[in-house]
Amino acid sequence: MDVPADSHIKYEDAIDYWTDVDATVDGVLGGYGEGTVVPTMDVLGSNNFLRKLKSRMLPQENNVKYAVDIGAGIGRVSKTMLHKHAAKIDLVEPVKPFIEQMHVELAELKDKGQIGQIYEVGMQDWTPDAGKYWLIWCQWCVGHLPDAELVAFLKRCIVGLQPNGTIVVKENNTPTDTDDFDETDSSVTRSDAKFRQIFEEAGLKLIASERQRGLPRELYPVRMYALKPMPN
């Protein structure tokens, strides 16, 4: 019997791997940083995706557009994209060298009052404050959670959403219906079908999905998923 890919995940191995990676854009993007199309195309794709969703993401009850950047690395997504959409951003990241660099990268946004809390913790140990977030953004990080832990994490995120809040998951997909385990960083790349199954198990409704365009062909396909809690 085949062993599920996610059963091989070890948090300690992942932390060890990322702690040894350079705290740079090139480091956090696995060598596809400056000098490649990946950072620019990634930001363009995310910006366009959120703009298309704008009318479905209106804050309610005088809430501010408070976002949280999950698996934030050195703060690249917040610095280049999220701050254009959100009034304030919290960040969640367990790797100490990345957090140290994050303070440098986000200094200007912090001076403008756009940076809130920085949580030095892994997703599996993070619980959001109830009703706090307009947007929970998870990019290139949920592969470090086994399936059951990811379902539990998403359920906690639902509690952390404002009324009409949204969760976005932006992740690699396998081009097949099977999941791939990468022992290098102890992570799993999931199929599109597996993600949809996990979202349903967590009680989330998929309101939009789009494939990221313009990335090098040798990379996995990347897909964005916009999610809202299923009606009770």
Swiss-Prot record:
S-adenosyl-L-methionine binds at residues 71, 76, 123-124, 139. This is Alpha N-terminal protein methyltransferase 1. Disruption phenotype: Defects in both translation efficiency and fidelity. It comes from the Eukaryota. It catalyses: N-terminal L-alanyl-L-prolyl-L-lysyl-[protein] + 3 S-adenosyl-L-methionine = N-terminal N,N,N-trimethyl-L-alanyl-L-prolyl-L-lysyl-[protein] + 3 S-adenosyl-L-homocysteine + 3 H(+); N-terminal L-seryl-L-prolyl-L-lysyl-[protein] + 3 S-adenosyl-L-methionine = N-terminal N,N,N-trimethyl-L-seryl-L-prolyl-L-lysyl-[protein] + 3 S-adenosyl-L-homocysteine + 3 H(+); N-terminal L-prolyl-L-prolyl-L-lysyl-[protein] + 2 S-adenosyl-L-methionine = N-terminal N,N-dimethyl-L-prolyl-L-prolyl-L-lysyl-[protein] + 2 S-adenosyl-L-homocysteine + 2 H(+). GO terms for molecular function: N-terminal protein N-methyltransferase activity. The keyword S-adenosyl-L-methionine applies. The keyword Methyltransferase applies. It is found in: Cytoplasm. Transmembrane segments: none annotated. Its main location: cytoplasm.
